[in-house]
Design a protein with these regions (language model features):
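Extreme N-terminal "head/tail" segments of very large remodeling/mechanoenzyme assemblies
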Residues: 1-84
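Gly/Lys-enriched N-terminal cap/neck module of very large, oligomeric protein machines
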Residues: 76-100
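Extended, charged alpha-helical "arm/stalk" segments used for dimerization and assembly
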Residues: 92-200
């Protein structure tokens, strides 16, 4: 579970009172709010984006964490990773460097790629599958089902974690998460890819 979400940004609303079980994040209007004032900018979407940022998302040029107002500040998350309490920290100005602390060990620096690989093994056993010669779904593809982004259209259809998610990726991810033989979905996608290539060759 997530114990705390924090930042060196002075105005950041630290979430340090999360409890085991279901936690609901709400934005509450004040007594003086009018019917035209919404709950936007209360931090609900930023909470989701921060989790993705701290679990190794790409953080491209359009990322909120790379804006001039936020790039120099560090964001962090204290959470349980398997049976170890773990703290991860990252900033937009140095997005390729991720700092991880698992007490009593000292803080260590990882690349974003290595961090994603580590999370993939710890949460889903992906590295072990790759070592055995398989090509499992990616960590980002699987993790996005648990932390859904509204901006990606993740709530449009339950079987997809993003509007643009391909059929093969969706099928393989879901079969993996349900404990089914996900390699069947991978083989289906290989057939679709071959059929697409043949169709393109016919049209030449």
């Amino acid at each position: 579970m997530i114990h705390n979400l924090f930042s060196t940004l002075p105005t950041f609303k630290n979430l340090g009172d999360l409890k085991p079980g279901l936690n609901v994040l709400l934005a509450q209007k004040t007594e003086g709010s009018t019917s035209k004032q919404t709950r936007n900018r209360a931090g609900k979407t930023s909470f989701i984006e921060a989790i993705h940022f701290l679990t190794g998302s790409e953080a491209g040029p359009d990322s909120i964490f790379r804006t001039p107002e936020l790039a120099e500040y560090t964001f962090g998350m204290d959470f349980d990773l398997k049976d170890a309490r773990t703290v991860v920290e990252r900033s937009g100005s140095a997005k390729a460097k991720i700092y991880v602390t698992t007490p009593p060990a000292a803080k260590r620096k990882l690349s974003a790629t290595d961090w994603v690989t580590f999370l993939g093994e710890e949460m889903f056993g992906l590295s072990s599958l790759e070592a055995a010669g398989s090509k499992p779904p990616s960590f980002r593809s699987l993790f996005a089902y648990f932390v859904r982004r509204q901006m990606s259209g993740a709530f449009t259809t339950p079987e997809k974690q993003a509007t643009m998610q391909g059929t093969g990726d969706m099928q393989m991810a879901l079969m993996f998460l349900f404990g089914l033989d996900w390699q069947i979905a991978r083989d289906w996608q290989a057939v679709r890819d071959r059929e697409k290539t043949l169709e393109e060759l016919r049209q030449r």
